[in-house]
Amino acid sequence: MKSYMARPGEVERKWYVIDAEGKTLGRLAAEISRLLRGKNKPQYTPHVDVGDFVVVVNADKVEVTGRKAEQKVYRWHTGYPGGLRERSYRQMLRKRPEEILRQAVRGMMPKTRLARRQLKKLRIYAGPEHPHAGQTPEPYEVR
């Protein structure tokens, strides 16, 4: 008996909507990365994109444990000399709450071309509304 290998044309994708309100950042990001990669499906194949689309709402209400709210710092470099920038978790939550969750999910994905393509199937919104009602996303409960 041969092993099953999924082909890109025969993959059936679903849309899931996840409410991030009151969820822990890391646990939520781990579950989202599993869905994006397709590891929840029996036809998972490492070199084929078999993952689903994920819509996250209420990203501004995600929680962190311990003292991360005061101590966590996001750093990046602009590419110019002296261009190291940093923002605290609280500043990021105020200015760009979607980016907190996007960076957490990105850190849990492999650093490959396939993972970058899979990350494009992630849609994050700060509030409770999203424009993807036409795709009829199923609610997905994160444990």
Swiss-Prot record:
Quaternary organization: Part of the 50S ribosomal subunit.
Domain of life: Bacteria
Organism: Rubrobacter xylanophilus (strain DSM 9941 / JCM 11954 / NBRC 16129 / PRD-1)
Any matching Pfam family: Ribosomal_L13
Stated role: This protein is one of the early assembly proteins of the 50S ribosomal subunit, although it is not seen to bind rRNA by itself. It is important during the early stages of 50S assembly.
Family: Belongs to the universal ribosomal protein uL13 family.
Keyword field: Ribonucleoprotein, Ribosomal protein
InterPro entries, per database record: Ribosomal_uL13 (IPR005822), Ribosomal_uL13_bac-type (IPR005823), Ribosomal_uL13_sf (IPR036899)
GO MF annotations in UniProt: mRNA binding; structural constituent of ribosome
Name listed for the protein in its UniProt record: Large ribosomal subunit protein uL13
Keyword Metal-binding: no
Primary gene name: rplM
Gene3D superfamilies attached to this UniProt entry: Ribosomal protein L13
GO BP of this protein: negative regulation of translation; translation
Phylogenetic lineage: Bacteria, Bacillati, Actinomycetota, Rubrobacteria, Rubrobacterales
Coiled coil: none
GO cellular component terms listed in the entry, alphabetical order: cytosolic large ribosomal subunit
